[in-house]
Amino acid sequence: MDENLLLSLIENNAKMEVVDLAAALNETEENVDKTIKDLEKNKTIYGYHTLINWDKTNHDVCTAVIQVNAKPERDYGYDRIAKKIYNFPEVDTMYLLAGNYEFLLIVKGKTMVEVAKFVNSRLAVIEGIERTATMYVLKQYKNTGKLVEDDNKDAAERLLV
């Protein structure tokens, strides 16, 4: 079975039924189901995610992208400081980077003030963190390969001259 194709299909549509996956892969349902279970067990598939346009709800969400400069620790590199950061519930996503900053965080809170308090009182005070740069998301156009639909798209296009 082409596991990469299976993973691509699931990544694109996690709700795709096993019968449809089997047909797309020209495999039996049993084989596809077993392969998915194996991929979940070995953590190749480590979760399923629903994309939500929070702007269409009455739930307040403020998303920030935070770049972090940190000093590596002897014998541990960045792993121990990363663990201190990623265990905060506000941290949605975290990457180790090559470039001007060591970490890139996606942080969520109810308001800009809540995110700022998190950065000021919990993140920036961690030993080894040298500097942070916080940017607030104003609008989301695309998330995980999917376009975020905008009801005002036509009106915005008409305004362009």
Please identify what each model-predicted range represents.
Residues 1-161:
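A compositional/biophysical signature of low hydrophobicity enriched in polar/charged and small residues
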